[in-house]
Amino acid sequence: MPDKGNIQLDTLQHQDHSQETASRYGGGSQLPEQERLDTNIQDDPVEYPGLIRVILITLGVALCSFCVGLDNTILATAIPKITSEFNSLEDMSWYVSAYLLVTSAFILSFGKIYTYYSVKWTYLVSLGLFELGSLICATTPSSAGLIVGRAISGMGSAGIFPGSVIILSNIAPLHQRPLLTAFIGIMSGIATVTGPILGGVFTDRLSWRWCFYINLPIGGVTAVVVFFFLKTTKVKKNVPTSHKIKGLDWIGTVVFIPAIVSLLLALQWGGARYNWQNVRIIMLFIIAGVLGIVWLLIQCWKQEEATIPPRLMQRRSIVGTCVYTIPFVGCVIVFGYYLPIWFQSVKGVSASQSGIMNLPTVVGTIVVGLLSSVIIMKVGYMVPFLVLGSVLLAVGAGLCSTFQRSSGSAEWIGYQAMIGMGSGLGYQLPLLVVQADVPAADVPVATAVVIFMQNLAGSIFSAIAQTVFQNQLAKSVQILVPSVNPKSILDGGTVGLSDRFPSDVLPSILQAYNTAVTHTFYAGVAAASLSVFGAFIVRWNVT
């Protein structure tokens, strides 16, 4: 039987947030103006829609999450054709960076916007921006237009995924959300894995522009469902607009955007366009660090009007999920990118075949994600599943790091499945943890924090993995095939190795690739192992 201090899933959503906030000010009934503003979101009794509406809304936002997931990876196989059509090889990195930078820069701001304004209309505006960006990308006659379109889509993406999670919190009680959240996460995960495959199919069979056209009808379905079936959240009309605008923390946002852009540019350019000792990379890190410190000071100064109120970061569950999310998602990102590289380079299969060989990860994520959601709905406790997710992910990552050129299907299927099971357990659960631990009025900001950490993890660990891979590949080639210039291998890409190298050196080249990829997997092993410490920071009785 749960302890008396436990937070019960079926009653948490109905807690009186006003009593909690009042207690912080001496137990009186008069709360500061900004605190009263925060409580406007959920101060009315919660009325959840019927089953049919819940299913339709969940399917609608899941479809949109699928599109957002696709946009993260679908260009991986389309970029060569795009750069060839526009003669824009120098712009190649911006096709990905423009989307990622804008998304990461505005996610936290959308957390505050969802706090003060209608969830329904904020989500629809975000979806409109995403669709507009996709339309521009699909029809643009120039490389510059594609970059602009990607940036606009990134702005919309910043509001879509946190909005999807917040919508779920408005249509279902907490004890029913694990299954819905898992479904959203699974759709996004499937899109991320299948993105390169679809990008290749569209590029080869139709046109790379269909990588963006596909978003338009799917987004249209989501817009119709949300418009007609999601009720508009109530916001008190007596709250002055000036208070809402002030609460969006414009000063913090102006400082935060260049800070995160500088950090992400340093991570993306370091080791790729410039070496890590280059003055440009060093200056970007310095700018990011200085502005980051200034932003933290602004958060302490603004308090309740900050982008992230400091009191939220004093909660163990918020800190724990952040510590958990960065390395956990980092590990998933490493294997999401480098397992296909291992299949295509070492095993010599095509991009579409590597996608099929990646199915054990996808199936493991789907099956365990859904099963664990049902179990959590029954037992209530979340932390044990966070721990188990870290353990399974670390073990699967460790086993994958033993891959050899001769490794058979039993090995890469079984080891991948374990990674998928770990991912299914731990990838989306931090979102439920923060929803269970924070007052209802703080759910939008807390959700945005976790999703921002997921994006940040992708940037950090993709940079780490790229550096490890390139350095180890160059080192292995110098040792195994000293007659071959390592730069020629790095510049030539990871596919078609058997066509580029003679048979007498090909086995050594393949061994060098195997060594480079498995050493990159070590970064994933370390990350998954570190994530378990974040799970232990979370209060055990968060249910």
From Swiss-Prot:
The chain crosses the membrane at residues 50-70, 94-114, 128-148, 151-171, 182-202, 210-230, 247-267, 281-301, 323-343, 356-376, 379-399, 413-433, 445-465, 517-537. Keywords: Cell membrane, Membrane, Transmembrane, Transmembrane helix, Transport. Residues 1-34 are annotated as: Disordered. One of its GO terms (molecular function) is transmembrane transporter activity. It is found in: Cell membrane. The keyword Membrane applies. One of its GO terms (cellular component) is plasma membrane. It is a multi-pass membrane protein. The keyword Cell membrane applies. SUPFAM superfamilies: MFS general substrate transporter. It comes from the Eukaryota. Pfam families: MFS_1. InterPro entries: MFS, MFS_dom, MFS_trans_sf. Its main location: membrane. Belongs to the major facilitator superfamily. TCR/Tet family. MFS-type transporter; part of the gene cluster that mediates the biosynthesis of the indole diterpenes penitrems. May be involved in the efflux of penitrems. This is MFS-type transporter PC-17. The lineage of its organism: Eukaryota, Fungi, Dikarya, Ascomycota, Pezizomycotina. The gene is PC-17.
